[in-house]
């Protein structure tokens, strides 16, 4: 069988995107006739959106907020066809243990945030407001890329640090920081990451998208049925720079809070919640229709077909 090659980008290199790494490692894509090669956008040399728009790639992981942003500016639509992460994968760290942490503890403090994407910041604003904290009373610094943000926190700048894995587990293990909150738990279920493509690819190659989504759903079912040790072992070849114990703990923390979607269906309720987060945070100004940014027709078929298999 001749495999259909696909290069799939992830916004940044992290085990947060384990469903992609696991799908490739377990052979689920190959069994659907796809030769999927994945890499981080930085290594590819283009952002996920840029690579899709200029035709360099056909499928990418990305936040739905990317398409909200494009639509809000009246630009070309990038539809999302399968949900991957149903919670934020970010965590809030402090310099010292804070067993009685309250969100009001951030008032007057500086949070060194994540600069590479706006969704973690927008979710933070929502969590603050929900807990009675005026976001203007908290200084959220989002100017530094990850390496510089990490160096700044280690150098004593800022009071809190918001980051994802593996940095979270690495800092907890070294004693440099202490976990005070999971943003995934604090924000609640939200379609944080999904697969996006172009309208033309959905129209011209629906069978390729179907095979890809069937592989995703098979991987999602596998992830739901295995423990952190098994998942970390499966994806380890894709993350050779992460020490095995750190990777297993990172996967375990993601898994315990149901970070990864159990199926590829991006539901309207999640879409509406994310839109509310982005509107109240000032990231978008208009209200957008679910049908304009999301196409679940192939995902729904993929679920039916996988579940019908013996």
Model-derived regions, located:
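Pocket-lining segment of extracytoplasmic ligand-binding domains
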Residues: 148-240
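Predominant activation on well-ordered alpha-helical scaffold segments within soluble catalytic domains
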Residues: 21, 68-71, 125, 169-172, ...
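Conserved C-terminal helix/tail region of periplasmic/extracytoplasmic solute-binding proteins
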Residues: 278-310
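Short amphipathic alpha-helical segments at helix boundaries and their inter-helical linkers
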Residues: 57, 154-155, 254-268, 301-309
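Short, glycine-/small- and polar/acidic-enriched structural segments
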Residues: 2-133, 140-143, 159-165, 176, ...
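Secondary-structure end/capping motifs
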Residues: 204-285
């Amino acid at each position: 069988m001749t495999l259909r090659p696909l290069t799939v980008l992830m916004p940044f290199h992290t085990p947060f995107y384990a469903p992609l790494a696991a799908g490739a490692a377990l052979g689920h894509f190959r069994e659907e006739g796809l030769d999927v090669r994945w890499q981080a956008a930085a290594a590819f040399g283009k952002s996920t959106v840029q690579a899709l728009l200029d035709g360099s790639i056909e499928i990418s992981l990305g936040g739905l907020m990317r398409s909200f942003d494009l639509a809000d500016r009246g630009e070309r639509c990038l539809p999302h066809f399968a949900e991957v992460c149903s919670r934020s994968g970010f965590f809030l760290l402090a310099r010292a243990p804070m067993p009685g942490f309250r969100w009001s503890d951030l008032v007057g403090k500086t949070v060194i945030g994540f600069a590479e994407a706006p969704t973690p910041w927008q979710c933070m604003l929502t969590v603050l407001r929900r807990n009675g904290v005026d976001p203007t009373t908290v200084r959220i610094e989002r100017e530094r890329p990850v390496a510089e943000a990490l160096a700044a926190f280690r150098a004593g700048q800022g009071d809190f640090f918001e980051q994802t894995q593996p940095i979270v587990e690495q800092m907890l293990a070294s004693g440099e920081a202490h976990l005070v909150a999971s943003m995934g738990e604090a924000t609640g279920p939200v379609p944080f990451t999904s697969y996006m493509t172009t309208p033309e690819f959905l129209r011209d190659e629906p069978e390729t998208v179907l095979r890809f989504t069937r592989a995703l759903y098979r991987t999602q079912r596998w992830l739901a049925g295995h423990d952190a040790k098994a998942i970390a072992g499966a994806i380890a070849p894709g993350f050779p720079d992460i020490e095995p114990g750190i990777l297993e703990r990172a996967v375990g923390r993601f898994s315990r809070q149901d970070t990864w979607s159990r199926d590829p269906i991006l539901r309207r309720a999640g879409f509406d919640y994310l839109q509310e987060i982005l509107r109240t945070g000032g990231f978008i100004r208009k209200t957008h229709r679910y049908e304009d940014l999301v196409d679940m027709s192939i995902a729904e078929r993929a679920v039916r077909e996988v579940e019908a298999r013996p």
